[in-house]
């Protein structure tokens, strides 16, 4: 109920007071055209460490303390749907459109958070990318939640344990998908890479189910040491 009332108030406020760009402060959008263009054109995919050899390629596109990370935090915890559309456009133009035909698989959000926020933020981002691509990129929900664990604030050890129980493959959807597109490139997407435990375990499940081409894309990660920049397999 708390989140529902908050969403209504937020929608009314947005109607009365248009949002300001999170990059430059310009009135009228959560991210203005100029800032979207700047972020997209300067986006660099950097290699994710700790992917455990599960993926053909594992990259992140920005840091949590940058504009993309701020947009994600607001979208998730304040239920600002408009920001998800801006994130999707930047990620599509800055990286995903360079992959060619691909299948996006969103990491499923816990059912508790979906109820609270009245949305699954990663599924919404992937659906918008599918729309922007004109059908070149497809979104398929190969994964579902198995257990409603919440990892925010958990230690790395707890996260690893939770990750093994958090998601499962949708066997019916996967079987149909593999019959129709056995050689498709699957792109597993999540908003934040912290320890990477959830994405790695999800990747293992997809590989075990028969997915042969698997890429991991985290939109942001916590800032640690600098990682080498790559774009579609090339050292930048």
Residue ranges of predicted features:
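Glycine-rich phosphate/pyrophosphate-handling loop used in enzymes and phosphotransfer proteins
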Residues: 1-236
């Amino acid at each position: 109920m708390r989140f529902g009332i908050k969403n209504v108030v937020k929608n009314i406020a947005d109607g009365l007071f248009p949002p300001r760009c999170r990059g430059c402060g310009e009135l009228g959008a959560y991210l203005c055209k100029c800032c979207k263009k700047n972020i997209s054109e300067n986006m660099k995919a950097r290699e994710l460490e700790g992917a455990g050899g599960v993926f053909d390629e594992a990259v992140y596109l920005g840091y949590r303390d940058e504009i993309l990370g701020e947009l994600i935090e607001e979208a998730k915890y304040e239920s600002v749907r408009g920001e998800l559309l801006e994130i999707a456009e930047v990620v599509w133009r800055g990286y995903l459109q360079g992959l060619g035909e691909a299948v996006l698989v969103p990491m499923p959000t816990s059912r508790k958070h979906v109820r609270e926020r009245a949305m699954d933020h990663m599924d919404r981002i992937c659906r918008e990318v599918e729309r922007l691509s004109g059908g070149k990129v497809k979104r398929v929900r190969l994964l579902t939640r198995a257990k409603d664990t919440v990892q925010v604030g958990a230690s790395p050890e707890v996260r690893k344990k939770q990750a093994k129980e958090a998601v499962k493959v949708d066997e019916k959807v996967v079987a149909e998908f593999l019959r129709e597109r056995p050689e498709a490139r699957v792109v597993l997407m999540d908003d934040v890479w912290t320890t990477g435990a959830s994405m790695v375990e999800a990747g293992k499940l997809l590989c075990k189910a028969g997915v042969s081409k698997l890429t991991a894309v985290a939109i942001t990660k916590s800032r640690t040491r600098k990682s080498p920049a790559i774009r579609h397999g090339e050292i930048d």
